[in-house]
A protein has these predicted regions:
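Membrane-targeting and insertion segments and their boundary/processing signals
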Residues: 84, 88-92, 129, 138, ...
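Extended, non-transmembrane interaction/recognition domains
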Residues: 39-40, 44-124
Length: 186
């Protein structure tokens, strides 16, 4: 079992990029969230690629707005039909949340859509050129994501309660004032 988590600062328009990669003989889970600098009311961009077996992969990517109860949407991208009850659209998840269940050999079929979402996000960031450093706008978002994060139960089963709570509470809600590029391995 191995877990690698990484927090870094990337580029002129981003405060933080968080990555988590968890592997064991049966599963391979990758998560990342890009946090843009503030002042332009932009969403974060989140992506999960979760392989739980040779037959089950869950792929999720979305524009995750830090404002609570704000329904963010991008014209021209697919809109979710609401069948994925775990993701509450308008509560940090957009109308465009992309969720797919597939097999490992089918993941690449979704790469064109991922590129389209990422291209739209890049255009948003470049057009608005966020420069602010007021990270308080992410406080509710980070709290909500920490409470909601399904990785808590998964990690508890793999690494025990103490390590899983440490990861979820200390890493996922890392203080921006103490943020430096760092990596932790379990």
């Amino acid at each position: 079992r191995q877990m690698c988590i990484r927090d870094s600062r990337y580029g002129k328009n981003f405060i933080k990029a968080r990555e988590a990669h968890i592997t064991d003989p049966r599963s391979d889970i990758y998560n990342t969230i890009l946090y843009p600098k503030t002042g332009a009311d932009l969403p974060c961009f989140g992506m999960d690629l979760m392989k739980f077996s040779e037959k089950k992969v869950i792929l999720v990517f979305d524009f995750q707005h830090p404002r609570e109860k704000y329904l963010f949407s991008v014209d021209g991208l697919p809109k979710d039909d609401g069948k994925y009850r775990f993701f509450e659209m308008g509560n940090h998840f957009s109308e465009n949340i992309f969720v797919r269940y597939c097999k490992p050999d089918e993941v690449d079929e979704h790469l064109p859509m991922f590129k389209q979402y990422l291209t739209e996000y890049k255009k948003m960031v470049e057009l608005n050129d966020p420069q602010g450093e007021d990270t308080t706008v992410y406080a509710d978002f980070d709290k909500y994501m920490t409470e909601l994060d399904p990785v808590r139960g998964y990690l508890k089963g793999k690494f025990g309660e103490e390590k899983s709570e440490s990861f979820v509470n200390d890493f996922l809600s890392v203080s921006y004032t103490h943020l430096r590029a760092h990596e932790t391995r379990f």
